A protein has these predicted regions:
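Short active-site-adjacent structural elements
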Residues: 141-144, 180-183
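Outer-membrane beta-barrel "beta-signal"
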Residues: 13-14, 158-165, 181-192
Length: 192
């Protein structure tokens, strides 16, 4: 769907975002809790109309006077097509790449629904350099009922973050766990 026929959409969005992260650019405590609902209405033949719900929950637990942080994230994206309609492949959520399942190539997994959990242990090495150990687990599925913990993809790794309290400007990571081998990540900005 969406390859041979390019539909036009009306898109409606409602968002709730509560942000208590402190500091916001490189959080050491607090959290961010976001819920977004989107409605895509196919303006033509109504073959690709669907609803989408994104839930992104992040929590930062300070340890040892904010020099060490446990960063946790849970994210779910669920799409629900209208009866007889489909979600175009380019609107289907994906997993894989430097911001979610880091041990897998970009867009490695794609389907109508995704579920992702991430945990990072971050510690200050020097004033502008942090170390990070991370573990990611996630899955895509055609139906929400198909999420079984034993079938989730997993990865882990280590990295370094360069930045200030205002934000991370560079992130270097090594991610492991996929059959494709190790992945080296050089990225501007924080993962979450």
């Amino acid at each position: 769907p969406g390859v041979l026929v390019q539909p036009d959409f009306y898109r409606y969005t409602a968002t709730i975002d509560v942000n208590t992260r402190n500091p916001r650019g490189n959080p050491r405590r607090g959290g961010q809790y976001a819920l977004r609902y989107q409605r895509y209405d196919d303006t033509g033949r109504d073959l690709f109309s669907f609803d989408r719900v994104d839930i992104d929950l992040q929590q930062y637990v300070p340890l040892v006077r904010d020099r060490r942080v446990l960063a946790l994230r849970a994210r779910a994206i669920m799409t629900d097509p209208d009866s007889g309609a489909e979600v175009p492949f380019y609107f289907q959520p994906t997993l894989g790449g430097p911001d979610d399942l880091r041990g897998f190539r970009h867009f490695r997994f794609r389907d109508r629904n995704t579920l992702l959990f991430q945990a990072e242990y971050r510690w200050e090495i020097f004033t502008a350099v942090d170390g990070a150990l991370f573990y990611d687990i996630g899955k895509v599925a055609p139906r929400r009922q198909d999420f079984h913990l034993s079938e989730f993809e997993r990865d882990f790794g280590i990295g370094f973050r360069f930045g200030t309290a205002n934000g991370v400007f560079l992130r270097i990571e090594g991610a492991f766990g996929s059959a494709a081998g190790a992945h080296f990540i050089l990225r501007f900005g924080n993962v979450f």
